[in-house]
C-alpha cells in the first residue's frame, strides 16, 4: 500500500515532530510512505475567509502531488475536511474526485482502513483529557457528538484504549469547541480566548495531566490559554502517543 503523507502548514512550521510521528507510525505497519516535497497548503485559510477561488492554485497542486497514491493521510481533521468537502475551486475531474475520496485523517485511517487491533509499542502512563476537534468530530465523523443524543462512539478513544497505562478523564463538555477556529481566532480574539480558557479550566478540573487531540492547531491554542492562566497542563498530538511517545 502506497501512502502519500500530507503535512499541514502549521505542523510543518511549528510542530514538525507531529509529522515525523505520523510517518514513523504508518511505517510501523509496513506501509510505504512518501512525502511529496513540493506540497503546500490545502487551501483552507482562503476558503475560510471567503476567498475560495484564490485557493485554486493550491488545490491543483495538492491533486498533482497526491494523485498517484493509494491513500493520502494527514494528521489533521481540519485539513482533511477541507479536501473532502471544499476542494472545489478547480474543475471536478475524475482525478480530483479520486484524490478527495482517498484522503484520510490519521485516526480514521488507522481505525477504518487498517483496522488496528493493537499498539504493542505504545505506553503512556498518564491521565489524559481528549479534545475532539470540531472538523474531525462533526466534519469527518471521528465520533458521535453528544448533542445528537444517540449511541456514542469514538474512533480516537478506541485507539487510545490500546495504549498501555493511559487513563482518559471525563470532561464536563467534551465536544465543545476550544475557540481556535482558524481565522476565527484572528477576527474574534476575545471570544476565542474565552472559549479556550473555559476548555483549559475544564481539563484541569478533570484532573488531566495531558491533553491529547488529533489537530495541532487546537492544541497550540489551548496550550497558549493554559500558559496565560498558569495551568500546568501539557499538550500532545495523538500521533505521538500512538507512536510510543515517552512523556
Question: In which residue ranges do the predicted regions lie?
Answer:
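Iron-sulfur cluster-binding electron-transfer modules in prokaryotic oxidoreductases
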Residues: 1-247
